[in-house]
Amino acid sequence: MTPALSAEEIRDVNTRYHDVAADHYDAKWGIDFGDLGQSQVTAKVRKALGRNDGPFARSLEIGSGTGYFTLNLMRAGLVEKAMCTDISPGMLSTLSANAQRLGLDVETLATDAESLPFEDESFDLVIGHAILHHIPDLGRAFREFERVLRPGGTVLFAGEPSRYGDRIANVPKRVATAAAPIWRRAIKARPASPADGGAPEASLEGLVDVHAFSPGELSSFAREADLEDVKVIGEELLANWFGWTNRTLEATAHPEDVPWGWRNYAYKGYLALQKVDRTLLESRLPPAIFYNLIITASKP
């Protein structure tokens, strides 16, 4: 059994992994800064906040990565000024390049979420996407979020893995792994080699995710930090199963051998099932069953 990493080791692994991944991260995860990305991000925010969705004068993003959340919110006019932080300088470098290409002005700072170098009550909005599950001490981090938030301000974190939803997602992953040789023969693809996309950080990928959450556990971090109006909702069920099936299959093949027709099918199918999840399932099923959780809270 691999011994548990210390908090400092988790931070170090996350820094190294994301520094190496930064150059091809957007391509790997299909991150978009056009109309599609903007509509996806604004849909998450409006789903979580309802009519109280801004615009926000000054936002702080934790674990900004390459800018998916903040840059799309700025393009949509929901955020006016933004500070983007990440433990990875490499990610922030890619974010800055993306912002320059989009004509957006953002501040960036490499820092740890558990010890933010900002004055009290500095921001109207504290946000993040797929970041909380990387942070060793979430209690300390949420106390920092509360400290730097102005009274009446909002906390919003999306894309956090649900413990039960993550277990369910292992089923399509296992099925896809078993079916991969047949799938590769059908599309005439060679098996992937160790040199295919992402090899430099592959050895660290299994170490960077340190949490999966139940809705109650995620809520407790916000409440213990004296935040109010705490709400957790779930998103993506069918779309997630479909997406993980396709990602698992594609990871077994040479990238250049995966035909455009397949990628188009996977892309359009994912969007279609996102719509099914959003319109039919998310309001009817408990949050814990979904793959992703969104948490919102406010500072009194």
For the regions a protein language model found, what residue spans apply to each?
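A short SAM/SAH-binding and catalytic strip from SAM-dependent methyltransferases
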Residues: L125-P136
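A short glycine-rich, Lys/Arg-flanked "PGG" loop and its adjoining helix->strand segment in the class I
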Residues: G139-P151
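A short acidic, Gly/Pro-enriched loop at the edge of an enzyme's catalytic core
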Residues: E114-L125
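Conserved class I S-adenosyl-L-methionine
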Residues: M1-G54, Y68-N72, T154-A189
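Acceptor-substrate binding/catalytic loop of class I
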Residues: E201-E217
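A C-terminal cap/extension of S-adenosyl-L-methionine-dependent methyltransferases
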Residues: G216-S220, V230-P300
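Class I SAM-dependent methyltransferase SAM/SAH-binding core
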Residues: L60-S115
